[in-house]
Structure formats: structure tokens, C-alpha cells
A protein has these predicted regions:
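A cross-family phosphate/adenosyl-ligand binding-site feature
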Residues: 2-119, 123-186
Length: 186
């Protein structure tokens, strides 16, 4: 059983966050606890992109982005993974630079220093050189950069199916057993 934190930033791609949360809700056999932290703009972007505020009915505990008393803000907690989905390039840059100025970046720093899973689902295109260097720095520090790039060999039939190819991969990278399409497996 894993405790997992989900950070949602204001980057475009709220559909990814919504699907991650739906998937985690369905993984009760693998996931003991889920905590959510929202950046300043995350809920605004969610409402703009998805046209709703479904996030208000989530059964997970939400933490304020300035709540450094949240359990996953400390290495002594038993949280095993943090997935930042979507991860803005600003957030990635602060993580790469070791700047822990809010709960999202502090939790990322904890995951790196404790050698736990940090998965950053970046959603930006095109990348500039600063983005690439920040992705390299986070990777070198032990994080995993998982671009929000859907795969199409599973022949997704909807936008949600395409987005799920990204979220399946992100949750697999966190160490969860996801029952999604896998190349060469029936």
C-alpha cells in the first residue's frame, strides 16, 4: 500500500490531473492515502479547460500550497511518491534549482532527497534550452520527467483515452500497477 501526493499546477492539461485522480480513487487495493496540493492557478485552469469544478467533490485531502505542516513536506513521512500533473515549467525550474518556496516544490525536494518517486508530467511545447536543462537537472537528481505526450499505438477512441496513455505511464512510474494498454501484451 502506497501513500501518494498529487500536485496540480496551473499548466494547461487539467484533463491529465482529473484522470490521475480518478485512477487513484479506483486503486484502493494499492493506494492507502492520496493527498492533493494545488498551485495558485490550478483550479482556475481546471475550470477553464474542463468547464466544471469537479475537484470540489474529490474524496482526497487537499492541502494549501503554503501548508508546510503537510505530512509529505517532511522526509519522516511515509509518502512514497509525488506526481506533479500537469507540471508547469516554472514549477520544474524551481525544483531543478532547489527552490522550495511552496508545498509543491518542498514535497518534490523531499522526494528527491529521500530517493523516493518524483514524477513530473510536463506540459509545454516547444521546449526552450532552459526547459531542457531543468529537465536534465531534475532527472540527474533522481526525478522522472514524463512529458504529457499521448501514445497512439493503443488506438485511443477519445480525448480521455489519449490522455489516459499519459496518466497510465505516470502512475506506473510511481510504482503502481496500472491496467492499461502495454505494447506486445494482450
Amino acid at each position: 500500500m502506497m501513500k501518494i501526493a498529487v500536485a496540480i499546477t496551473g499548466a494547461s492539461g487539467s484533463i491529465y490531473a482529473k484522470i490521475v485522480l480518478q485512477q487513484l480513487q479506483a486503486m484502493k487495493a494499492q493506494v492507502e492515502e492520496v493527498a492533493i496540493v494545488w498551485s495558485d492557478n490550478a483550479k482556475t485552469v481546471w475550470q477553464h479547460e474542463l468547464g466544471n469544478s469537479d475537484f470540489e467533490s474529490l474524496s482526497f485531502k487537499s492541502f494549501d500550497k503554503n501548508d508546510f505542516m503537510a505530512p509529505f513536506a517532511s522526509g519522516s513521512s511515509s509518502y512514497g511518491a509525488l506526481v506533479i500533473c500537469p507540471c508547469s515549467m516554472g514549477t520544474l525550474g524551481r525544483i531543478a534549482g532547489g527552490i522550495s518556496n511552496d508545498l509543491i516544490t518542498r514535497a518534490a525536494d523531499v522526494m528527491l532527497k529521500e530517493r523516493r518517486k518524483l514524477v513530473c508530467v510536463v506540459r509545454e511545447t516547444p521546449y526552450n534550452l532552459i526547459h531542457l536543462r531543468n529537465m536534465a537537472a531534475v532527472t540527474e537528481a533522481g526525478g522522472i520527467v514524463c512529458p504529457a505526450t499521448p501514445s497512439f499505438y493503443s488506438r485511443p477512441q477519445s480525448l480521455e483515452d489519449a490522455a489516459r496513455t499519459v496518466t497510465d505511464r505516470a502512475l506506473q512510474l510511481c510504482g503502481l500497477d496500472v491496467k492499461g494498454y502495454k505494447w506486445g501484451e494482450s
